[in-house]
Amino acid sequence: SDGRFYRVSVDQAELGYAARYVGYAHNQETFKFLMDPMLQNGAEKVSAMGYGNAINALSDAEGGIAKYFSQRFAQVTNPPLDSLRESDGMTLRVCLGEKPYLGKNRGKQIVIDTPILTSVEMSTLQGQKLVAVEHFCLLYHAFSEDTERNEESLTAKIDEVATAVSKFAEERGGIAVLSDRLMDSTNACLPMILVISAINQKLIETGVRLKVSLVVESGQIASSHHIACALGFGASAVYPVACLLYTSPSPRDR
């Protein structure tokens, strides 16, 4: 009830792998065009520029909030951004924890080389003692047969999580881990991007945005587009649960 989250392994969870993927709004397209190419080649699948599918508002497969931000046109930069040849001026490094400000030295920060965390990095982050870490659950009680009650439940939970993170920032500050790992048949995932945006706005309104970094542990992340949306709306780092789950089950489970 306080928004906190206590870790258990996926094997102990109520839902199986297939049900969890459905709950995270993934389908065959997610695996065929996003996850499989990345796992096989270490890179995204090369395809046509732009987004040729029906816009999400007119699709019968909702597919998550991130799809509402898919571009319908090709966009390039001139000159192109090149993180390899321009490494002196570009970096993916991220500092987690309360940001330092003039006249105040509130503590230390943790520097990571990339905003995409591995299992080892996530465990290390949560086990360290230099920066305070608090967990917040991104789940709500879903009412699949009653849209009005479902909307009320979802909205109330988003407000609750945003308030809890703001309180953590005011009282302690540090790293807020937002997780939907413990989804089950009763408690559905809060839309990741909506929650990140709501928390970000709440922290700005209360004047404590620089006192906390948001780390998102979510199964809703399955592509670079999902990552870009999460980071763009206020997250500092992500831990893509579904992608890592997809590498772990046996071929029979997959």
Give the residues covered by each predicted segment.
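Alpha-helix-loop-beta-strand connector modules within alpha/beta enzyme cores
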Residues: P191-L210
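Glycine-rich, proline-tolerant flexible connector loops at the mouths of alpha/beta enzymes
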Residues: L178-L190
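Alpha/beta enzyme core
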Residues: A162-V177, L210, A228-C229
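Conserved small/polar residues in nucleotide/adenosyl-binding loops
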Residues: Y246-D253
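Hydrophobic faces of well-ordered beta-strands that scaffold small-molecule active sites
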Residues: A176, L214-E217, V238
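Glycine-rich phosphate-binding active-site loops on the catalytic face of alpha/beta enzymes
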Residues: G234-L245
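Extended, highly charged accessory segments
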Residues: S1-V161, S166, E170
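Catalytic cores of alpha/beta
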Residues: A222-F233
